[in-house]
């Protein structure tokens, strides 16, 4: 849980840094290439093939390609149509995707209690960030929702792989980032604009921060933390970046939030986490234990 909180704080800076200094100034495909390329370099020394099948390695590369490669390309394009606050608002459905996709991948019945606690988190984040949207609303909304879905598929896929095809996390992430990097290379050569390269030391510095710290270290901590909690808690924590991102905007760019809705929304998100951990998760575990006991008795 602590790793998820630390990463949320770290990522709160990423949204604003990219939106303020890179979006519209640096080619989005090049930004993705540098970001995942630097992250891949961080874990390159841990790349191992011994003891792992090609299928397992390929699956870890696939989830990396989805969670980082494709997700970044979609979300970075969305910055061209949305403000930072709008983009934050449109990510609030991610907990629902995470919870439902995990149930689908696990081939289990949909747990509506998990969906309910995730929906509370969605409501809380929506309270914080609901405001007037720009004319490019629909395009931006579509891009962000596709980004949310690919992020959820990658995150849940990684969690499932750790459950069914485990390997040391640092080895897994070497393949994870390699998959994302291959997607970014292909996208850059096919769609990139070489005329929109970083022009200032600040822009290069932000790219290095996003690649090494936010992606390289941040995603390792997030996905490692994801393996330590249930899918419902994971989905709710994913929405904590909304109040965290707003606090960063307040501290650095002095963008004042509407305090009544900010406090109300943050309390709803925290309440959703408390409700989930107090009632929903224990009840789901008890139900699963009862089913296993019934099956054992019937045998």
Swiss-Prot record:
Activity regulation behaviour: Biotin uptake is weakly inhibited by CCCP and FCCP protonophores and by the respiratory chain blocker NaN(3).
Coiled coil: none
GO cellular component, one term: plasma membrane
Top-rank taxon, per record: Bacteria
Effect of gene knockout: Deletion of the gene abolishes biotin uptake. BioH-bioP double mutant is unable to grow on trace levels of biotin.
Function of the molecule: Uptake of biotin. Acts probably by facilitated diffusion.
The name this protein goes by in its record: Biotin transporter
Origin species: Escherichia coli (strain K12)
Gene: bioP
């Amino acid at each position: 849980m602590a790793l998820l909180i630390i990463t949320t704080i770290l990522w709160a800076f990423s949204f604003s840094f990219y939106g303020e200094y890179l979006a519209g100034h640096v080619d989005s495909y090049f930004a993705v290439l540098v970001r995942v390329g630097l992250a891949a370099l961080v874990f390159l020394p841990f790349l191992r093939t011994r003891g792992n099948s090609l299928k397992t390695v390929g699956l870890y590369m696939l989830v990396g390609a989805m969670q980082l490669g494709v997700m970044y390309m979609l979300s970075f394009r969305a910055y061209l149509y949305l403000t930072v606050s709008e983009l934050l608002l449109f990510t609030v459905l991610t907990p629902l995707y995470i919870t439902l996709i995990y149930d689908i991948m696990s081939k289990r019945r949909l747990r509506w209690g998990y969906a309910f606690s995730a929906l509370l988190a969605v409501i809380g984040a929506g309270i914080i960030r609901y405001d007037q949207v720009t004319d490019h609303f629909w395009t931006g909304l579509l891009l962000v929702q596709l980004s949310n879905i690919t992020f959820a598929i990658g995150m849940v896929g990684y969690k499932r792989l750790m459950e069914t095809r485990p390997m040391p996390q640092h080895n897994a992430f070497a393949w994870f980032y390699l998959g994302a990097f291959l997607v970014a290379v292909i996208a850059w050569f096919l769609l990139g604009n070489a005329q929109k390269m970083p022009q200032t030391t600040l822009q290069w510095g932000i790219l290095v921060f996003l690649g090494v710290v936010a992606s390289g270290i941040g995603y390792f901590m997030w996905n490692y933390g994801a393996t330590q909690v249930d899918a419902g808690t994971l989905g709710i924590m994913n929405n904590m970046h909304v109040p965290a991102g707003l606090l960063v905007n307040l501290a650095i760019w002095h963008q004042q939030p509407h305090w009544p809705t900010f406090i109300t929304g943050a309390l709803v998100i925290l309440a959703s986490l408390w409700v989930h951990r107090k009632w929903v998760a224990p009840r789901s575990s008890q139900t699963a234990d009862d089913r296993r006991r019934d099956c054992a008795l019937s045998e």
